[in-house]
Amino acid sequence: MAPPNKFRINAKNYFLTYPHCSLTKEEALSQIKTLETPVNKLFIRICRELHEDGSPHLHVLIQFEGKFQCKNQRFFDLTSPHRSAHFHPNIQGAKSSTDVKSYMEKDGDVLDHGVFQIDGRSARGGCQSANDAYAEAINSGSKASALNILREKAPKDFVLQFHNLNSNLDRIFTPPIVEYISPFSSSSFDQVPEELDEWAVDNVVSAAARPLRPVSIVIEGDSRTGKTMWARSLGPHNYLCGHLDLSPKVYSNDAWFNVIDDVDPHYLKHFKEFMGAQRDWQSNTKYGKPVQIKGGIPTIFLCNPGPNSSYKEYLEEEKNSALRNWAVKNAIFVSLNGPLYSGSYQGATPNRQEDNQTTTG
């Protein structure tokens, strides 16, 4: 007569179920962590659920560093710290740790220890298809959550297509651009030259009232004359300072105008696109796929005097004569002789314009 089958499970991932177990997740985790095994435990997830009669039970997922052979069906027994009671689990090898992990998440009452190990089988096994993984990623609500889901459930795509995934998820989960609220109302600037006021009235307007080809403006003046604060008080805008970042994270195609502040004209990419208020152009100033710019809005260029700042001096260079002839047809140039505000406004309490829905870059 053949001897009875001996208990033995040889697996890297174990799925345990403790029926009618009154232990808390923390009590169970503490005991499981102390179990001595020849291979390290890398990840433990404990889930607490209630039966229909209200009695609790626990599910446990354990991921080992390598295969662990268990020959003792009492090895994973837990004890109550409060009374004389033992809790014996149903023990299974988990073919797809990701499917088990997802199953345990359905009620949300889980406790994790360690770092979850990606299981290649999870992308092909069970009912988890690639479409399911991507649908879950899109519905996750954030780029970080979506990437984590794809890392677990579509590891091949995560490794081979990470660049595309990263770029596409940036577009899908583009956060709203932080609104800029000007600390000063435009009326706070009581020394604005008439030509600046006239330019703003004609060109800084909503899309419905905007000229087909608005005119840009270059404002040159010393530091602390109020150039930047005045420009940013005019309405919804894109603010680009020091360098250009036209990614959807910071650049809005719904802005009324651009402000380019303290960018050396020698290194300004898309000079004509900005100054000429050109429409429907592409930029790849940052690494990655080109960004489509709607355009058609004027730009305020702010600069200080000097060879590395002044747009006038840049355009007066002999090699830029053709560009100068083009620029004077597409922008006006204003040099400030003093601040845009009188002394009485210096140090005054700023007047906030709560309706000035501007964007920042």
Swiss-Prot record:
A motif (RCR-2) lies at residues 57-59. The active site is at Y103 (for dna cleavage activity). One of its GO terms (molecular function) is ATP binding. A divalent metal cation binds at E49, H57, H59, D107. GO terms for cellular component: host cell nucleus. Residues 156-176 are annotated as: Oligomerization. ATP binds at G221, D222, S223, R224, T225, G226, K227, T228. Residues 8-116 form the CRESS-DNA virus Rep endonuclease domain. Its EC number is 2.7.7.-, 3.1.21.-. Its cofactor is Mg(2+); Mn(2+). Residues 143-153 are annotated as: Binding to RBR1. Keywords: ATP-binding, Covalent protein-DNA linkage, DNA replication, DNA-binding, Endonuclease, Helicase, Host nucleus, Host-virus interaction, Hydrolase, Metal-binding, Multifunctional enzyme, Nuclease, Nucleotide-binding, Nucleotidyltransferase, Transferase. Belongs to the geminiviridae Rep protein family. There are 3 rolling circle replication (RCR) motifs. RCR-2 is probably involved in metal coordination. RCR-3 is required for phosphodiester bond cleavage for initiation of RCR. Homooligomer. Interacts with the replication enhancer protein (REn). Interacts with host retinoblastoma-related protein 1 (RBR1), and may thereby induce the transcription of host replicative enzymes even if the cell is not dividing anymore. Interacts with host PCNA. Interacts with host SCE1 protein. This is Replication-associated protein. The lineage of its organism: Viruses, Monodnaviria, Shotokuvirae, Cressdnaviricota, Repensiviricetes.
